[in-house]
Amino acid sequence: VSAKPARTPT
């Protein structure tokens, strides 16, 4: 599991 939340790149 990644520590950073999965955000979609703009």
Swiss-Prot record:
What name is this protein filed under?
Answer: Cytochrome c oxidase subunit 8B, mitochondrial
Describe its assembly.
Answer: Component of the cytochrome c oxidase (complex IV, CIV), a multisubunit enzyme composed of 14 subunits. The complex is composed of a catalytic core of 3 subunits MT-CO1, MT-CO2 and MT-CO3, encoded in the mitochondrial DNA, and 11 supernumerary subunits COX4I, COX5A, COX5B, COX6A, COX6B, COX6C, COX7A, COX7B, COX7C, COX8 and NDUFA4, which are encoded in the nuclear genome.
- Tissues expressing the protein: Heart specific isoform.
- Which locations, inside or outside the cell, does it occupy? Mitochondrion inner membrane
Name its GO BP terms in alphabetical order. oxidative phosphorylation
Q: In which pathway does it act?
A: Energy metabolism; oxidative phosphorylation
The answer to whether keyword Cytoplasm applies is no
Any one of the GO CC terms: mitochondrial inner membrane
Keyword Ubl conjugation included in the entry's annotation: no
Q: Which key words are in the record? A: Membrane, Mitochondrion, Mitochondrion inner membrane
Cysteines paired by S-S bonds: none
Protein family (similarity comment): Belongs to the cytochrome c oxidase VIII family.
Give the membrane topology, semicolon-separated if more than one: Single-pass membrane protein
Q: What does this protein do?
A: Component of the cytochrome c oxidase, the last enzyme in the mitochondrial electron transport chain which drives oxidative phosphorylation. The respiratory chain contains 3 multisubunit complexes succinate dehydrogenase (complex II, CII), ubiquinol-cytochrome c oxidoreductase (cytochrome b-c1 complex, complex III, CIII) and cytochrome c oxidase (complex IV, CIV), that cooperate to transfer electrons derived from NADH and succinate to molecular oxygen, creating an electrochemical gradient over the inner membrane that drives transmembrane transport and the ATP synthase.
